């Protein structure tokens, strides 16, 4: 059983090393995903990020993370 865990770990590590880095225009962050999954009827919101701090604004509410 221990050998299967070691093989799985090696496969995971080598696949993560071999994958190219994600470009900025194709990346996403968890804040945008959460807002897009759990938004209600309000369709207009903006996500602003600066130095890994996020602000999500709508006309009715604001979230600072």
From Swiss-Prot:
Would you tell me the protein name for this molecule? Protein C13
Provide the family line.
Belongs to the poxviridae C13 protein family.
Q: Which domain of life is it from?
A: Viruses
Query: Per UniProt, which keywords does this protein have?
Result: Early protein
């Amino acid at each position: 059983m221990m050998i299967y865990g070691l093989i799985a770990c090696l496969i995971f590590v080598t696949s993560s090393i071999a994958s190219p880095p994600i470009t900025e225009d194709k990346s996403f962050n968890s804040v945008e995903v959460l807002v897009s999954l759990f938004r209600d009827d309000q369709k207009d919101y903006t996500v602003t990020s600066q130095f890994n701090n996020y602000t999500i604004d709508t006309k009715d509410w604001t979230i600072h993370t």
